[in-house]
């Protein structure tokens, strides 16, 4: 279970970093800098040139997301938004892998295997909420649930990692099998 322990610690670190990117996005007002999903202004990696940024700002005004008097979206805001968005795919992959590994290891206690189902469910909910946060133009209920579920994902990953570490410790020093 050493590799499982490393994977669970990686999940904790990845989720923590994702929450940091989310906080950075919130505090730099980057949440509405990209109005579409799955692409960003119709591209995987939108241009951050001055002309492109001017075009994006005009598009945001036409779509009613920004007003002409609002501060225009800057390249750094789009970059931060993309960082949070694309890192989410990596985090979802790590948590999905951890969830399936927990389910596959029949030697694990039932509570740890069941945590695999919980991880798969919660990462699916969180990913879906992230998509709807963008598509709803940061509607406050959707956005609030996205933030709360993000914190819950971190808590579940930390507890899972601690449970795996405890199991490894008990097995190593006492030959204890917690089935």
Regions found by a protein language model. Name each.
Residues 1-179:
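Polytopic transmembrane helical bundles with strong interfacial aromatic enrichment
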